[in-house]
Structures are given as structure tokens and as C-alpha cells.
Amino acid sequence: MYCPFCHNEQSRVIDSRVIDSGTSIRRRRECAACKGRFTTIEKAVLSVVKRNGLAEPFSRDKLIRGVKRACQGRDVSDDALKKLAQEVEETVRSHGSSQVNANDIGLAILEPLRDLDEVAYLRFASVYKSFESADDFESEIRLMRRRDRDSF
């Protein structure tokens, strides 16, 4: 790590802390040459592999925008969406891989969204699972009711 003051590449870590719900590490460093102190933030990069094979950086904001469309007209707060996005990100990061399929993110969204708002869940699931008819909605509703019944 280069010192921002004298550009020496030797520094020592004085303090390290986990930040951003475990996705980043903040390090306080001291330059070996000039004794200047500076802070670095190291972030674990998570890439999303899309259906077409291209990879792009994971974006919590993009996830929120997608779920927000499903929640349109529903009584779902921005804070609830942020919490859901954080939960989904933690779920996909917990697999320990630096790459995740877009499909896996969609799967990780379904359960917390169902707990948040069932109508938004159905809207999201209809796009994610490519519903083609009312029968698809009916079978998904039956699955939801069965899961609710089995959870008691």
C-alpha cells in the first residue's frame, strides 16, 4: 500500500475493523518512512453473472430498484427494501464465492420478499419464474398456502 503523503510502499496496519455488515474492512495504517497515518477500505468484490454470460459488479441499488417495481402501490417502506437487499446480499456472500449467478440472486430474493409482502412476492415471482397464465399464479398461491400451513 503506497503512502498518500510520501509514496513509500511500506506501511504497517495499526487497526482493522469490519464495516458495512461484513462486506468491507477498514484499516488504519502508518507509513514506515514518514510516519503519516492514513485509512484504507478493502471491499470484497462480488460479481453477478447474467444469463447472457457477462459479469457485472453486484449492485444493492439495482436489487432495490427491481424489488421496488414489484412493490409498486404496496405499503412497503424504503427501509424495509434496504433491509431486504442487505439480507439478500448477505445470503449470496455467505456462499463464499466471488461470483454469483443472477438466477441465485432471484432465488435469494423470493423468501424475504414473501415475508415482507405476498402481493409483491407474486409480482416478482411471476417475472422471475416466467409465469405464462393464470394457472401459474394459482399454483404459486397454492404453494404459498401450503408453506404457510406447514409452518404452523
Swiss-Prot record:
Supply the InterPro entries for this chain.
Answer: ATP-cone_dom (IPR005144), NrdR-like_N (IPR055173), RNR_NrdR-like (IPR003796)
Q: Which UniProt keywords apply?
A: ATP-binding, DNA-binding, Metal-binding, Nucleotide-binding, Repressor, Transcription, Transcription regulation, Zinc, Zinc-finger
A GO biological-process term: negative regulation of DNA-templated transcription
Protein name from the UniProt record: Transcriptional repressor NrdR
Q: What does this protein do?
A: Negatively regulates transcription of bacterial ribonucleotide reductase nrd genes and operons by binding to NrdR-boxes.
List the cofactors. Zn(2+)
The record's comment on cofactor binding reads:
Binds 1 zinc ion.
The organism encoding this protein is Corynebacterium aurimucosum (strain ATCC 700975 / DSM 44827 / CIP 107346 / CN-1)
Which residue intervals define the domain ATP-cone in the entry?
46-136
A molecular function GO annotation: ATP binding
Q: Which Pfam families match?
A: ATP-cone, Zn_ribbon_NrdR
Of which family is this protein a member? Answer: Belongs to the NrdR family.
UniProt gene name: nrdR
Q: Where are the zinc fingers (unnamed)?
A: 3-34
